[in-house]
A protein has these predicted regions:
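Conserved active-site tyrosine of GNAT-family acetyltransferases
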Residues: 125, 130
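Conserved N-terminal entry element of GNAT/NAT acetyltransferase domains
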Residues: 1-19, 169-175
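A structured, mid-to-C-terminal "fold-capping" secondary-structure block
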Residues: 149-178
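Conserved GNAT acetyl-CoA-binding A-motif
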Residues: 105-118
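A conserved beta-strand-loop-helix scaffold within acyl/acetyltransferase catalytic domains
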Residues: 11-85
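Conserved catalytic-core motifs of GNAT/GCN5-like acyltransferases
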Residues: 131-157
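Short glycine/proline-centered loop/turn elements that form peptide/ligand docking sites
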Residues: 96-100, 120, 138-144
């Protein structure tokens, strides 16, 4: 009888991951999402990664990168969650919950934790205490602030005492700004 290799959680900064490890994470993203772009990949780099691995297989991943968001006239240090995925054949086993618990543990390092999700992810994140931002969203572009109405309702924040009905503005980046 073959004993399955137990899964384990690995936390590492992007700079601590090998090219092989990053390649495995990228392969996971491509398998999990039909439309994962180079910009999406770039957004998940430069911060802390949580990986659930077994042997040399990456079962699940998520990262937190530092961004700036404007709320109530103040620039907040935001831990922004990116690239959360579980291998399609490994879903439903708690791997994404392991990843999120590790990433949520980084909250004390930031003023605010946020993410943007699809409708399919709303219940998962909501069950973990993430709340929808109810106010209008926008992005600070090189040409000024522009509304991002397609993101309204998709932006979630980890339980925080901010006014969730206030306008929220993120910093500029290529690809999906939220």
């Amino acid at each position: 009888m073959v004993t399955p290799t137990p899964s384990r959680l690995v936390m590492a900064h992007t700079g601590e991951l090998t090219g092989e490890e990053l390649g495995a994470v990228r392969a996971l993203m491509d398998a999990a999402f039909d439309d994962f772009t180079e910009d999406d990949w770039s957004h998940g780099l430069g911060g802390m990664h949580a990986l659930v691995v077994t042997g040399d297989e990456v079962l699940a991943h998520g990262s937190v990168v530092m961004r700036r968001v404007l709320v109530a006239g103040r620039s907040w240090r935001c831990g922004y969650v990116e690239a959360v995925a579980t291998a399609p054949t490994r879903r439903g086993k708690g791997h994404a919950s392991m990843v999120m618990a590790a990433l949520e543990g980084l909250a004390p390092a930031y003023d605010l934790m946020a993410l943007s999700t699809s409708p399919a992810g709303q219940s998962f994140y909501g069950s973990r205490g993430w709340q929808p931002w109810r106010g209008p969203s926008s992005v600070m572009t090189p040409h000024g602030t522009e509304p991002t109405p397609d993101e309204d309702g998709a932006i979630l924040v980890l339980a925080h005492d901010l006014d969730l009905d206030a306008p929220i503005t993120c910093d500029w980046r290529d690809g999906d700004v939220w």
